[in-house]
């Protein structure tokens, strides 16, 4: 048999092809660049660095492109760069065409310039000098062909679309080509700087517009407003001198108690006059209670401070609230490598799932202040529970301290995996407040809490929650969250709309808010005062319900928006206020209060949680120990909204948010928020505000609004009347007198003195303890007498 020789086919690898092209384009770039640089008209070709070939190539390029010929070496260098990066062929072709339009457009734009004279030495010896009916010869900056294309005899762009049209068209093509060639990373870097500049200009324009708007309001509402102290009257032409007529300055006598608001000469200040405020009518006489309630205290003799207009405020216009400019600003910059790092994490995540036999792809990638979230799209047949079981393995491969798996994401065919952000950034409270004040959305009782995992702002309305429980260990961000909530209320609502009752058993966290004009009473630090405050809130709730029932209204919103009927309201035995403010009760360290008097604290809390929503009374409870003896079944059932910071174990997480997950949080403001109607807890990074900003806001509010407590102190508040008189024993008052006179509060003592049985005497002792006349039982020790005889009726 004849053997046939097989010739081995020679084929080059793609890497070799790219390397050859790169070398060719780089050689052409160097060849053309050196020949153009060493070319001159008045020198022989022997002086050119590339010799005759270089001199001829330079003459050709300069004759056809003029000054734009110096872009040709850059064009070849760009082609070499594309091949060096192994750019795909379609993309490389588009970029090559885009770069090729640059010298063409430059040549046409340069041809629009008249043939130039007196060029620099470098250009005069290189640009073509041709005699075209011009004496002496002149240089054509864009080359002879492009000059003829622009301003030729038979056909020209100047004749077809004019000089302006030619310039606009080719300038637009040039800019489009340059924009297409600019790398995306460079655009993103400059975009951050441009966004910062635009935000600065927007803030300044907003401030200017607010000042102009306020000035226009002053001009409209005050007819006597005069922006200048004097008025110049033009004199007739016969007058030799012009006279200036000055308006007399009115002298206003201020009350003595308001003179401390002014310093310096008051005659130089502009004072807006308001019409006299009519005295508020007392609708019906009433008896003075032991301690006036919030609604009963609003009489003509003691009006709410903010209801009477200040002589320095335009009539009909409420004082402004503190703006976000008062808070400190932090510049937060994201590193450019964050997106690339998250893409690498996504690739590792997909490989990890594939190694465990889970076929899935990665969808959207969201990056927030401290979290990064990945959407995993499992293929058909993959069990979601199988992904959730790999939580520890995924955390190991991603090198994450902790992860959280949402399986599945509500409303999506995907599984969410949240990991710590490689470059965490704090959330500044000023940014939230700025976005809220500039936005159009307005909430009744706004809480600006922080930002979601995707970077969006998160705020909610306490009026719809309607009560809130906050739980977390020490250092998890619970106290900062409470400060953020208080700052949200006082910087978005005036004292006439929101009132606060704050209980702080630690005595150091929240006592600085005592001077706020929003406070009904100074910050409460004792458990006895806390119980009295809760009893007062229950009475206030009952009083508001009585008023709503009398007027036939359903809630506080309909009451505040009603049209007042003076005749009907005057027939009620108590004065009906014009407006009911929202009341927010904030209790920190609930577990400490429950340890001291569990039944006394829990009962009014449950009553308020069950009934107080419609009348605008809301509770916010905070605790470090979310155990079942603190968050009882009754409290948990009436608090549908909860915030869980990092807790100790899964049991505590199950108690606070009904599922595990809070034990894996990162701390420092990382929280899970459960709201009514939500399908799953929402991951939020809490906002941070420093103590200096809090002090500045409190000082600013105290200078704007007077602080007048409705209840100066709960130390002397008698809450025994909170018990139903019908449920008291007929011998209750007699037993109370005996106990206070003798100082003996024992069951056997009441049996002997009142000649009753043991069961009835023990019941009376329990009623005295509930009325906080005697203390709880201490075993063999006698009960403590909590009320002095001088404060009781004989």
From Swiss-Prot:
UniProt: ATP binding residues: 475-480
Record keyword Transmembrane helix present: yes
FtsK domain boundaries: 455-654
Cystine pairings recorded for this chain: none
Subunit note: Homohexamer. Forms a ring that surrounds DNA.
Skewed-composition ranges (Low complexity): 299-311
Sequence ranges on the Cytoplasmic membrane side: 180-794
Topology term for the membrane: Multi-pass membrane protein
Protein name: DNA translocase FtsK
Gene Ontology cellular component list: plasma membrane
Cell cycle as UniProt keyword: yes
Transmembrane segments: 17-37, 59-79, 96-116, 129-149, 159-179
Main location: membrane
Region named Disordered: 265-311
Entry comment, domain topic: Consists of an N-terminal domain, which is sufficient for the localization to the septal ring and is required for cell division, followed by a linker domain, and a C-terminal domain, which forms the translocation motor involved in chromosome segregation. The C-terminal domain can be further subdivided into alpha, beta and gamma subdomains. The alpha and beta subdomains form the DNA pump, and the gamma subdomain is a regulatory subdomain.
Compartments it resides in: Cell inner membrane
InterPro entries assigned: AAA+_ATPase (IPR003593), FtsK/SpoIIIE/SftA (IPR050206), FtsK_4TM (IPR025199), FtsK_alpha (IPR041027), FtsK_dom (IPR002543), Ftsk_gamma (IPR018541), P-loop_NTPase (IPR027417), WH-like_DNA-bd_sf (IPR036388)
Keywords carried by this UniProt record: ATP-binding, Cell cycle, Cell division, Cell inner membrane, Cell membrane, Chromosome partition, DNA-binding, Membrane, Nucleotide-binding, Transmembrane, Transmembrane helix
Family of this protein: Belongs to the FtsK/SpoIIIE/SftA family.
Purpose of the protein: Essential cell division protein that coordinates cell division and chromosome segregation. The N-terminus is involved in assembly of the cell-division machinery. The C-terminus functions as a DNA motor that moves dsDNA in an ATP-dependent manner towards the dif recombination site, which is located within the replication terminus region. Required for activation of the Xer recombinase, allowing activation of chromosome unlinking by recombination.
An individual GO BP term: cell division
